[in-house]
């Protein structure tokens, strides 16, 4: 967890973070650190997007992560309650080739993500996977 927060403070993030596991507290801390450190206050209006798994339209999410930031070095897209998303299939091409100016944070709380899925394997290959344990 400290390594991820240090990446955010130093503004050297990876393109994708999968935060998953039983302990929601650490996932919330990392997500808040991303909001606090990756963008300046004046950049957040146009470059910080927070969506919730049960409400997200996956086509729109895919379009959002492929956009370029507005008057900033990067954009940050946070998917909270990602455990409610049934399928990440539409995002597979993005996970294989993420946009370098987007930081996608997937907060998958209260259970582990299935490490056998293509989704998990691609995120592991191109990003950071953090398991939050009690």
Report the location of each language-model feature.
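Conserved beta/loop motifs at nucleotide-recognition and modification sites
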Residues: 1-134
């Amino acid at each position: 967890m400290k390594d991820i927060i240090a990446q955010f403070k130093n503004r050297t993030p990876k393109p994708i973070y999968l935060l998953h596991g039983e302990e929601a507290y650490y996932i919330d801390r990392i997500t808040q650190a991303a909001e606090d450190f990756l963008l300046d206050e004046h950049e957040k209006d146009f470059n910080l997007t927070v969506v919730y798994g049960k409400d997200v339209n996956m086509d729109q999410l895919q379009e959002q992560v492929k956009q370029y930031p507005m008057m900033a070095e990067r954009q940050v897209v946070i998917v909270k309650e990602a455990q409610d998303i049934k399928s990440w299939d539409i995002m597979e091409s993005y996970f294989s080739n993420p946009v370098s100016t987007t930081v996608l944070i997937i907060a998958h709380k209260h259970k582990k993500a299935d490490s056998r899925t293509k989704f998990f394997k691609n995120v592991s290959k191109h990003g950071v996977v953090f398991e939050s344990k009690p």
